Amino acid sequence: MGSDRTLKKQKMSVLQELKKITTIVADTGDFEAINIYKPTDATTNPSLILSASSMERYQPLVQKAVEYAKGKKGSVSEQVAEAMDYLCVLFGTEILKVVPGRVSTEIDARLSFDTKKSVEKALKLIALYKSLGVDKERILIKLASTWEGIKAAEILENEHGVHCNLTLLFSFAQAVACAEAGVTLISPFVGRILDWYVANTDTKKFEALKDPGVISVTNIYNYYKKFGYKTLVMGASFRNVGEIKALAGCDLLTISPALLKELENETESVVTYLSVSNAKLQDIEKITVDESRFRWLLNEDAMATDKLSEGIRKFAVDTVKLENLIKTYLK
């Protein structure tokens, strides 16, 4: 009996098994939670920064950002903008103290249709990181996968050596455009695709391997590896651990602390579903997308159109909430 207990103790958790074949990323701004699960990288977004900024233990960071902004001349709205940028960078800097890899910092969602301003904002964030002693190699600038966002990423990568993470990615057309732009990494969403199919079709439950979000990421991964694109695929937005396990082998998976905990508590063998060798065997046609084709294909995809616009709106709403929170400190 004692030996059975010893065996159970020695058996690796699903999270440990996954770490052998996939880079695990923590999807949170709560860097104390990140420290528990020892991921390689971390991702943040406006909603996660808002959530963390509302926690008592992170008030000193908010105060620090506000003090920084007060030292800048300008109107209240300009000071709020300064505080917002600095706060995102402060969170990123703290996160980098507990992860060995990179952190993703997101561009204001309200710039999703402005290439020039997205580039300017990204370079400002990179400069702020540099002022705090953080090298740009440890930063991924997150941009929405609009045509304008993808073009901004292309400029940042090619002209400034800034690595980009293209988020709110729901369609194959978006993925192809990102690969052709040569971005460092994409974050195709899984759970939000599932949400759309549950809400808009008669099927309310999907097995993990038949989950439309899992299928979407699998198709993108296979396409990238088949044709030798350097862009990495980081599955994101998970609703359950089944989706995560069905994407074992993906370049990276970014996972919330709640689901990381579930994976840590499970012990079972992990099957590698995604691999370069298997992708090379797939019968896939190579396509190319210019702006008009990108817009047409996106428009033809009701799910992707809905979810991209909804995602941008949600991040914009949470950005405004964070601005309002900062305003209370500036008064």
Curated annotation (Swiss-Prot):
User: Where does the record place the catalytic residues?
Assistant: 142
SUPFAM superfamilies per the UniProt record, alphabetical: Aldolase (SSF51569)
Enzyme class at the top of the EC tree: transferase
**Pfam families this protein is in?**
TAL_FSA
Record pathway: Carbohydrate degradation; pentose phosphate pathway; D-glyceraldehyde 3-phosphate and beta-D-fructose 6-phosphate from D-ribose 5-phosphate and D-xylulose 5-phosphate (non-oxidative stage): step 2/3
Q: Does the keyword Cytoplasm apply?
A: yes
Mention one GO biological process in which this protein takes part, according to its record: carbohydrate metabolic process
Q: Report the superkingdom from the record.
A: Eukaryota
**Could you tell me what reaction this enzyme catalyses?**
D-sedoheptulose 7-phosphate + D-glyceraldehyde 3-phosphate = D-erythrose 4-phosphate + beta-D-fructose 6-phosphate
Task: Specify whether Repressor is a keyword of the entry.
Answer: no
Q: GO molecular-function annotation terms?
A: transaldolase activity
A Gene Ontology CC term for this entry? cytosol
Locations listed in the record: Cytoplasm
Enzyme nomenclature, EC number: 2.2.1.2
| Keywords from the UniProt entry | Cytoplasm, Pentose shunt, Schiff base, Transferase
Q: Which NCBIfam families match?
A: PRK12346.1 (NF009001), talAB (TIGR00874)
- Quaternary arrangement and interactors, per the entry? Homodimer.
Q: Which family does it belong to?
A: Belongs to the transaldolase family. Type 1 subfamily.
This molecule's function is given as: Transaldolase is important for the balance of metabolites in the pentose-phosphate pathway.
> What is the designated name of this protein?
Probable transaldolase
